[in-house]
């Protein structure tokens, strides 16, 4: 029996000795998911999915329910930390070429889409002013689909406008989708351990492995403790840091907010949507802003897996990160110059990464062959 099997038999998962802190975000995401399900359950006990009572029920949770304000704020801040962790997790995957493990990457992209849908449904539930108008604008994008659009929108709304049936089904979906996320996360982890984790060098780490426990369990615990500390610091000192002030007013279908925007973690996609002055084009760009991640495994051309030794690709990667932040920032601003042109330029840069990366991989291969 090989040493690897002996380690597995001893309940010690063999892991590459050189995986860095960037590999800790998976366990942090799992912690976030558990936190969201636990706090969400306690919130659901007291929440009322009715357009006349939803806003009041959220106020009731924060004011009257014992420790309700902690549950509500943990759930809201936890969602933001969840997305911070998942964006870092995806960026790590792009940088170190982890997308070459196709099954893991594609299951992860599916997880991201379901997570975004879950967060969107959750944002609508308090039935505040921004909740209502963000839901109206985003669901209305379905009407851009030729032939089927209007029928699909009416079906999703449960009527001819956003109303009580919409809120009820959004609550049902927001409750059930996290369980889908749990099952998909299990598949994601099983598929990962089918091949094993990669490492920063992008090389095979079979020759140099150490037991997962105690080395990586302590390393994971450190990052989880830091994340929990950040969560409780925000909760204690600035619980409304990541909330929209507009959402503290009850939804009013007769008054449109001056500037409609979703939560900060959707602003990159919303910024891309707004940068195109055409409804169908904008909707396609919005969908592609996430779906384009699925192309990464099929367009990789470099002989080197990781970007660690590819300076040209590193420049393009960090441009993508800067672009992501820029689009997020411009999406918080009104639709007026210079923000329109900044948003359009940033959107072009965002999509160009997925075109430039394979071209640079091919160029780097040529340079290496010349040096040989």
UniProtKB/Swiss-Prot annotation:
One GO cellular component term noted in the UniProt record for this chain: mitochondrial inner membrane
Topology within the bilayer: Multi-pass membrane protein
Keyword entries, A-Z: Electron transport, Heme, Iron, Membrane, Metal-binding, Mitochondrion, Mitochondrion inner membrane, Respiratory chain, Transmembrane, Transmembrane helix, Transport, Ubiquinone
CDD domains cross-referenced by the UniProt entry: cytochrome_b_C (cd00290), Cytochrome_b_N (cd00284)
Keyword set includes Lipoprotein: no
GO biological process, one term: mitochondrial electron transport, ubiquinol to cytochrome c
Note: Heme 1 (or BL or b562) is low-potential and absorbs at about 562 nm, and heme 2 (or BH or b566) is high-potential and absorbs at about 566 nm.
UniProt protein name: Cytochrome b
Species: Walterinnesia aegyptia
Lineage: Eukaryota, Metazoa, Chordata, Craniata, Vertebrata
């Amino acid at each position: 029996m090989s040493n690897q099997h002996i380690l597995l038999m001893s309940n010690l998962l063999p892991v590459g000795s050189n995986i860095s802190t960037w590999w800790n975000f998976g366990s942090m995401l799992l912690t976030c998911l558990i936190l969201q399900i636990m706090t969400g359950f306690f919130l659901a006990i007291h929440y009322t999915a009715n357009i006349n009572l939803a806003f009041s029920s959220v106020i009731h949770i924060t004011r009257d329910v014992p420790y309700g304000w902690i549950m509500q704020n943990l759930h809201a801040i936890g969602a933001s930390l969840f997305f911070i962790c998942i964006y870092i997790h995806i960026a790590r995957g792009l940088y170190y070429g982890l997308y070459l493990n196709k099954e893991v990457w594609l299951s992860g992209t599916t997880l991201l889409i379901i997570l975004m849908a879950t967060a969107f449904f959750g944002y609508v539930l308090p039935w505040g002013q921004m909740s209502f108008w963000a839901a109206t604008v985003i669901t209305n994008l379905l009407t851009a689909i030729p032939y089927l659009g209007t029928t699909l929108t009416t079906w999703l709304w449960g009527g001819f406008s956003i109303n009580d049936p919409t809120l009820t089904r959004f609550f049902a979906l927001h409750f059930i989708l996290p369980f889908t996320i749990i099952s998909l996360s299990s598949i994601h982890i099983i598929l990962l351990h089918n091949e094993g984790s990669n490492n920063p060098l992008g090389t095979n780490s079979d020759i140099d492995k150490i037991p997962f426990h105690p080395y990586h369990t302590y390393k994971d615990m450190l990052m989880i403790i830091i994340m929990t500390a950040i969560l409780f610091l925000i909760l204690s000192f600035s619980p409304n840091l990541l909330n929209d002030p507009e959402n503290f007013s009850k939804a009013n279908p007769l008054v449109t907010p001056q500037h409609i925007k979703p939560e900060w973690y959707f602003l990159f996609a919303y910024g891309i949507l707004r940068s195109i002055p055409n409804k169908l084009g904008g909707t396609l760009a919005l969908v592609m802003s996430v779906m384009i991640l699925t192309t990464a495994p099929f367009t990789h051309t470099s002989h080197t897996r990781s970007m660690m030794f590819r300076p040209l690709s590193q420049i393009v990667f960090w441009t993508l990160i800067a672009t992501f932040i820029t689009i997020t920032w411009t999406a918080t601003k009104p639709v007026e110059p210079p923000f329109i042109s900044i948003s359009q330029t940033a959107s072009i840069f965002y999509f160009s990464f997925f075109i430039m990366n394979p071209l640079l991989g091919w160029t780097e291969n040529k340079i290496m062959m010349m040096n040989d």
